[in-house]
């Protein structure tokens, strides 16, 4: 059933609001946060913030409130693509209105028009926890063409300028005990390993967004299953799965990070899957939002570790003290 709720802003639930030039948007709220997704294009999740707080998602000012173009627009926010990237198929113009269905008090499904030239139907389910900042996103792709295709879901969050991406690394091993590799690092043709925006540390890989610099990107087979972004006094935390027996796109990547002068993207990917006609795949992300006030050196693992230690819990001794950093 496709329907709308009252535009009255609710303490907990779903309402419709105008936002940043778009007239038709869903607002999901609970006691802690609000999440806003536009129905005029996309779908795009445009805002995710504590009440009265900073929105870590980027919205491009020159594209805010626009719709109906015949070419693809980034616009910012969070979106669903499919991998591997293709200069035509990937950039299907998603500039038309989005249908929606309410599945629960703070649970909706967004469905754009089908990508007929690609033979795909995309959907994003958004479920806000009853309390706290947690959000569960289910990204779904269904094959509506006649012939099988192999692809992966690709969930991209366009983050606000001026922050730092944080990717945890596995514990250090020992030689000769640990003889086999435990991670992949994938580079793009425009990635310069001497770029000062990158910091490849003992505990973390860090990438700083810089308004004066051009594109750079890496991908990883990331088994730890979370990454995040520090900006504006908040830490945006994204969790995702790693399936060790699965094949992932881009030489085995389930996590990719891209930045340019305008923004930074945190991107999680699902396994490569062959879809026959009528078959679907799903890819789940879990979001959290935490206060992270204080100054820090973007190349100081110790300072960032101390900032994040109360926020992110991980099994084992991952958050053991980082000495000498």
Predicted features by range, described:
Residues 2-140, 144-325:
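Surface-exposed acidic/polar loop and edge beta-strand patches at domain peripheries
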């Amino acid at each position: 059933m496709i329907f709308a709720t009252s535009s009255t802003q609710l303490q907990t639930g779903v309402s419709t609001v105008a936002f940043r030039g778009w007239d038709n948007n869903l607002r999901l709220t609970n006691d802690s946060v609000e999440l806003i997704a536009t129905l005029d294009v996309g779908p795009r999740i445009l805002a995710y913030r504590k009440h009265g707080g900073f929105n870590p998602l980027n919205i491009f000012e020159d594209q805010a409130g626009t719709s109906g173009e015949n070419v693809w627009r980034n616009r910012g926010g969070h979106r669903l693509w499919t991998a591997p990237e293709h200069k035509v198929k990937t950039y299907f113009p998603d500039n038309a209105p989005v249908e929606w269905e309410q599945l629960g008090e703070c649970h909706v499904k967004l469905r754009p028009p089908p990508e007929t030239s690609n033979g795909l139907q995309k959907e994003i389910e958004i479920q806000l926890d009853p309390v706290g900042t947690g959000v569960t996103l289910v990204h779904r792709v269904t094959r509506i063409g006649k012939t099988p295709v192999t692809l992966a879901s690709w969930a991209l969050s366009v983050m606000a300028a001026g922050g730092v991406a944080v990717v945890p690394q596995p514990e250090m091993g020992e030689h000769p005990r640990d003889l086999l590799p435990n991670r992949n690092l994938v580079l793009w043709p425009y990635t310069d390993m001497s770029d000062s925006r990158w910091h490849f540390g003992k505990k973390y890989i860090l990438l700083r967004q810089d308004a004066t610099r051009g594109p750079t990107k890496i991908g990883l087979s990331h088994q730890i299953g979370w990454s995040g972004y520090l900006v504006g006094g908040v830490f945006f935390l994204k969790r995702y799965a790693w399936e060790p027996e699965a094949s992932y796109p881009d030489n085995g990547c389930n996590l990719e990070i891209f930045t340019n002068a305008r923004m930074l993207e945190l991107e999680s990917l699902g396994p490569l899957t062959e879809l026959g006609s009528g078959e679907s795949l799903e890819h789940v992300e879990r979001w959290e939002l935490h206060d992270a006030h204080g100054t820090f050196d973007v190349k100081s693992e110790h300072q960032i570790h101390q900032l994040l230690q109360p926020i992110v819990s991980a099994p084992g001794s991952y958050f053991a003290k980082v000495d000498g950093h």
